[in-house]
């Protein structure tokens, strides 16, 4: 029991460390800043953060959510992204155990988390994230090569439909980044799970979009990336169980 608890603690710590790097990507990629050489600093006073200011999650709590020098508030995004990434890693390892699949899905979830925040703010999905997920799909497919046809169909079945929709509406109904996202995630998940993920993402997005319009009383541009990503994450964790329940219920 104790070794298992220690393992999950290590996994969570690893998750929040990667989550800290995701915050760097979320902040710098839209601004086209260098993600390697640029020093982390306070957005208010420019104070260059020391290593002890950058300990994921714990530094934020120790500083009370404020800059060490100017005492300006630090965005709550930083601890939320770190903690959420850690929790997602725990869920993946709880579901898939110590396996290549767990490693691939953890990296997938991190990419989805970062691109979701960027897309929500900028309405663009940086192409690098889709290329990264494509690489994960190829690696995953190499370990599950007997299912290559499922993955190939998954790559095409949703993305081709969305591509037609994209050109038919001049990009007003769906973004090009969303088309690519569904293609590369389909390569990773296979056709059954990507269809489930797409439909679920559309439902989640529609409901939240309607709530936002109802509350604000005005229209909003819908960034689909976060909702499609949520659909993919749910499909990875519970999609097969849902599909099995659905088939048993109706057949």
Segments the model singles out, each with a brief description of its role:
Residues 211-234:
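Interfacial loop-to-transmembrane junctions
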Residues 20-77:
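Membrane-proximal soluble regions of multi-pass membrane proteins
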Residues 1-29:
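Long, highly hydrophobic alpha-helical transmembrane signal-anchor segments
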Residues 18-23, 85, 89, 140, ...:
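Alpha-helical transmembrane segments of multipass membrane proteins
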Residues 102-103, 107-206, 210, 245-251:
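Functional transmembrane core segments of multi-pass inner-membrane proteins
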Residues 81-88, 129-137, 179-181, 224-229:
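Core segments of transmembrane alpha-helices
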Residues 4-12, 78, 82, 101, ...:
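Residue-level signature of transmembrane alpha-helical entry/exit and packing/kink sites
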Residues 92-104:
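Transmembrane helix-loop-helix
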């Amino acid at each position: 029991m104790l070794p298992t608890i220690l393992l999950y603690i290590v996994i969570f710590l690893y998750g929040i460390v990667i989550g800290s790097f995701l915050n760097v990507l979320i902040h710098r990629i839209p601004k086209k800043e260098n993600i390697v050489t640029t020093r982390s600093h306070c957005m208010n006073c420019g104070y260059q953060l020391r290593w002890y200011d950058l300990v994921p999650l714990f530094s934020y709590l120790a500083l009370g959510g404020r800059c060490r020098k100017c005492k300006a508030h630090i965005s709550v995004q930083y601890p939320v992204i770190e903690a959420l990434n850690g929790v997602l890693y725990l869920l993946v390892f709880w579901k898939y155990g110590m396996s290549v699949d767990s490693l691939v899905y953890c990296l997938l979830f991190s990419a989805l988390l970062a691109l979701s925040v960027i897309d929500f703010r900028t309405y663009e999905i940086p192409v690098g994230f889709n290329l990264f997920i494509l690489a994960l799909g190829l690696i995953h497919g190499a370990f599950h090569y007997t299912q290559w046809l499922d993955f190939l169909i998954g790559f095409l079945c949703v993305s081709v439909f969305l591509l037609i929709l994209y050109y038919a509406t001049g990009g007003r109904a769906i973004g090009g980044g969303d088309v690519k996202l569904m293609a590369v995630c389909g390569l990773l998940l296979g056709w059954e799970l990507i269809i489930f993920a797409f439909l679920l993402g559309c439902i989640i997005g529609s409901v939240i979009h309607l709530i936002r319009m109802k509350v604000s009383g005005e229209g909003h541009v819908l960034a689909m990336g976060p909702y499609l990503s949520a659909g993919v994450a749910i499909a990875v964790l519970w999609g097969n169980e849902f599909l099995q329940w659905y088939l048993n219920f109706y057949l």
